[in-house]
Amino acid sequence: MSKQPSPHKMIRDSSEFIHFEDRASDHPFVEKVWRCHSDRADKFLSVAANSFEMALTRLAGRTFLTLRGPETSSTLMDCPAEGEWVCIRFKPGTFMRGFLPGGLRDHHDVTLPPASGRSFWLKGSALDYPSFDNAETFVKHLVKSGIVTRDPIVEDTLLRSPRNLSLRSAQRHFLQSTGVTYATFRQIERARYATILLREEVSILDVVSRLGIFRPGPPHAIP
């Protein structure tokens, strides 16, 4: 089965057959909002990613919303022709109750049941599909309803200012709320940054230097 593309994961020249744009968000739980459409069917490389996402798909007369978790490795995927997508990418540590990122990891996506052409079922209620322009309003409703939440310990850990927790407790919080370990999270971030640099034709030696690939991590890093 082909997987619909997540725009921020495109690493080939998307101008060939996929056109997309993104924007920043002022919502504290949202990292970015994306949308794209495809002119024809082709393949794309879905690179490793740490994010939890909600992706709205319009394809062949159908509309549906899919929940996606982190991807720990890159995968060559099929992109269908004449599809449209809107994607909400959440900040690390944000998750939906009942659909933890670990359960969605590595293409174990969950498509929520449609209620109509404009809405879907979630927790017994029919909700309108989000759009590129009203994504924040959609997320605010989910947060207010207690459906989407965020673990502040994840942000503290990434900022290297963990709360008064044992190492084991911090590790448990991080894994549960992101779906990956801290070490895996950092590896994925470095790989994604390296991909961006290589696309910008930065030399391999400069990429290695910028990423500090051979530099040992600090002794207090969470494994």
Regions found by a protein language model. Give the residues of each.
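Alpha-helical bundle regulatory/interaction domains
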Residues: 1-167, 177-182, 196-217
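Short, basic, alpha-helical segments at the C-terminal edge of helix-turn-helix-like DNA-binding modules
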Residues: 186-196
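A generic alpha-helix surface/boundary motif
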Residues: 168-169, 189
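Short hydrophobic/aromatic patch on the recognition helix
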Residues: 170, 218-222
